[in-house]
A protein has these predicted regions:
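Sequence signature of WD/YWTD-type beta-propeller architectures
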Residues: 2-742
């Protein structure tokens, strides 16, 4: 061995250091390269979300109502109930709590003062010296792109209903203020792309749901219960790792938390009653956790020994029950509170002990009502104010003087509008720096070859239509009118968009066709009528053909067809259709669907239930039929609507990998309330959750140009609150007696 200066060990050390530095730089460069390919814009639909327009409202109860339950007849009140809007018409705002600032800790109030609320608090105290301390509103808002917890000062001192003049003055003061609501995540470092929901305040601590920690297995909810202290600035996970909890409620003492949990069972895809268990544990650290009762959800503490919750009774009605969480007797059975004849759910207990607030569904509209615990009668509330609007998730103020809820702000009782526009596109917080995410007011978005335009199926028309808009949501134009879905832009002919023409979710024998729509990029802006023509590419009598996707060179289309009696994949000529060329790509007595062809022509991604009937996994296949293999499996769940990145190296898709993010009864109708967007590399590695939502996200499209939230257009449509309530509530029999305010 040759030595240098008689010190070989230093020579070796130098070589090792150089090698380490080289490999580190190489690995870092590779990681940066991999991260760099995850870029552009993913547009997608969130079912109904763009028309929710949720704001939080309260109704002040008359003072004599606090004595309700003394066995007298229905409460009679001479004046009309008044509703106060507590949030300010941005994005969607929901799941609130209203608490007196006198119950908040000094560290919390100091934080709010430092944030800029000091003058507002002092102003209210000066104006209302004899009133109770101002109230704090905790609520969830998506105003910054993801569901986050905010704390704000409501319109009036103590949440009291004021005269129109007084309320107008106060609203002006608040809206002209530069002080935004305080976002809870400001107390901690790191991104906030995940969901925070269902906040409750006790002392200096906020307890809430968060999806920040991934679950340990597919199809398990990421929901966990967390607490953030204003005194210590420390955030703790209270749920055990690997356990999914929903709908937390804090005891009046602040010592205990009760949750609805999937602990001890697997979620099997149910979207109505979840058969959760109610667990109680210490609010300080999650210790002393134990099961209270099986089959319950949405707990609400009335006092230290009474918790109300909902479940589906044996007679089929959603009903409210109560239980003593500290009664250790083995024969304790929950007591049914609300009678059969009306669906009652999402209870909110009052501190009076005489009544509870509940959501009900009697006909087709969800309302908030009061249930008298002694007379066993319902009292109308929101139906008297907005009879044709859905109202969600009631809450009761800490004084029990107000009942709150959230509803679409689109209309006043007199029919006038309270919202300026339902946006056409809206930014969503992305966990990846170079990747933009946007909601689209429609479905099946597809990007033009240069990424500057988006074709999509509009959701605001009486019948579906194909629209085209700019990437920022401006210059919307109607291209094709009729029942369309499953859009795909031609990669070489910028004026051609392929579409599925016909009804959705139909049998293999239904007539559904693939069409090529012309002049998609030059249609008249805001035209009243469609300005493009189309060409049928599939033959008459070939039954159900859907989801076209062009090859990277624009010569061929892959699509799903049921012409054989089973839904499999076929390839045809992109210009002249199957009349010129047709090739069957897959064959079997299963469903292969949602094909997407990579821009480099190498792979076709698709969803298939060939491994588990009715459950869909992600597959890849070469266009010549070779190389078929499964990329990801949700075992036994759903992976649907895959879409390649513009560079063909990654895939985005919708899946139930993260289970549910809320009890489905607490949100509007969703076809699949467990759908979120994920991406991965084409070999299945690098799986990343993109969206965190209690609503269904799906039908993604991926364009090559990123778009900042500040660049998005404010154009949209007139608000009309066009969304449905859940479809799993069925009317069974006659409704029980109810009362109303007069």
């Amino acid at each position: 061995m040759v030595t240098i200066s008689g010190r070989p060990k230093y020579h070796r050390l130098l070589l090792l250091c150089c090698f380490w530095l080289w490999t580190t730089v190489a690995i870092t460069a590779e990681q940066q390269q991999q991260e760099a390919i995850i870029q552009g814009t993913i547009a997608f639909t969130t079912h109904g979300r763009m028309h929710y327009d949720f704001d939080v409202y309260t109704v002040s109860l008359p003072s004599q109502f606090l004595s309700l339950g003394n066995g007298s007849s229905c409460l009679q009140q001479q004046r009309r109930l008044q509703e106060t809007r507590m949030t300010y018409g941005q994005s969607v705002n929901y799941n609130a709590q209203l608490v007196s600032s006198s119950l908040a800790s000094v560290p919390l109030l100091k934080t709010l003062h430092a944030h800029g609320f000091r003058n507002l608090l002092e102003t209210e105290k000066e104006e209302e010296q004899e009133q109770d301390a101002p109230q704090l509103l905790l609520y969830v808002s998506e105003m910054e792109g993801s569901p986050q917890v905010y704390i704000d000062i409501p319109l009036g001192p103590g949440g009291k209903v004021q005269s129109q003049d007084s309320e107008g003055i106060r609203r002006t003061m608040r809206e002209e203020s530069t002080v935004p609501p305080f976002k809870l995540s400001m107390l901690r470092a790191g991104p906030s792309a995940f969901l925070n929901d269902r906040p409750s305040l006790t002392g200096d601590t906020v307890v809430y749901v968060s999806t920040e920690e991934p679950s340990e297995r597919p199809r398990q909810s990421w929901n966990g219960i967390y607490s953030t202290s204003f005194a210590s600035r420390v955030t703790k996970r209270l749920s055990p790792h690997g356990v999914s909890d929903f709908s937390p409620s804090i005891s009046p003492s602040g010592e205990w938390v009760m949750v609805a949990s999937t602990q001890g069972r697997e979620w099997d895809g149910e979207i109505g009653e979840l058969n959760l268990g109610l667990y109680v544990f210490k609010a300080e650290d999650g210790s002393q956790r134990r099961l209270v009762v099986q089959n319950g959800g949405w707990p609400s503490w009335a006092d230290s020994s009474t918790v109300f919750f909902h479940r589906v009774a044996q007679d089929g009605w959603w009903s409210i029950y109560k239980i003593n969480p500290f009664d250790s007797s083995s024969d304790q059975e929950p007591e049914r509170v609300t009678p059969p004849g009306v669906h009652a759910f999402t209870p909110a207990a009052s501190s009076t002990g005489n009544w509870i607030a509940v959501a009900t569904r009697r006909a087709s509209t969800r309302h908030v009502e009061i249930f008298d615990l002694q007379t066993k009668k319902f009292v109308k509330l929101t139906e008297l104010i907005n009879p044709n609007v859905h109202h969600y998730n009631p809450f009761v103020s800490s004084s029990s003087g107000e009942i709150g809820y959230h509803r679409c702000r689109g209309t006043h009782p007199d029919g006038s509008s309270t919202a300026s526009v339902d946006l056409r596109v809206e930014s969503v917080t992305s966990p990846l720096e170079n990747l933009s995410l946007i909601h689209v007011d429609g479905s099946f978005p597809s990007f033009s070859p240069d990424g500057s335009l988006i074709a999509y199926v509009g959701s605001s028309d009486d019948s579906a239509s194909m629209n085209v808009m700019r990437l920022d949501g401006s210059e919307n134009r109607k291209v094709f009118t009729g029942d369309v879905f499953g859009l795909a832009w031609d990669p070489t002919r910028k004026d051609i968009v392929y579409a599925t023409h016909g009804p959705v979710f139909r049998s293999t024998q239904t007539s559904v066709h693939i069409v090529a729509v012309n002049n998609a990029d030059t249609a008249d802006v805001e035209a009243d009528k469609a300005s493009s023509s189309c060409k049928y590419l599939t033959k008459e009598g070939t039954h159900n053909n859907a989801f076209p996707s062009p090859s990277g060179d624009g010569k061929y289309l892959v699509f799903r067809s049921g012409r054989s009696g089973y839904k499999n994949l076929y390839i045809m000529d992109a210009v002249d259709g199957e009349e010129k060329y047709l090739h069957r790509l897959t064959e079997g007595d299963w469903t292969d669907t949602h094909p997407n062809w990579s821009s480099d022509n190498e792979w076709i991604a698709f969803s298939s239930d060939r491994g588990h009937p009715g459950r869909f996994a992600l597959y890849l296949i070469h266009p010549n039929g070779t190389g078929l293999h499964r990329v990801l499996n949700s075992s036994p769940g759903w992976i649907n609507h895959p879409c390649f990145s513009p560079d063909s190296k990654s895939l985005v898709f919708t899946s139930d990998y993260a289970g549910l993010s809320a009890e489905p009864i607490s949100v509007p109708h969703q076809f699949q309330p467990y759908g979120d967007l994920f991406i991965c590399r084409i070999d299945g590695t690098g799986l990343t959750r993109l969206t965190h939502s209690s609503n269904e996200n799906g039908t993604p499209g991926w364009g090559r140009i990123p778009v900042a939230a500040s660049m998005l257009s404010k154009e949209g449509t007139k608000p009309f609150c066009d969304f449905s309530d859940v479809d799993f509530l069925q009317r069974i029999g006659a409704a029980p007696q109810m009362c109303s305010f007069q």
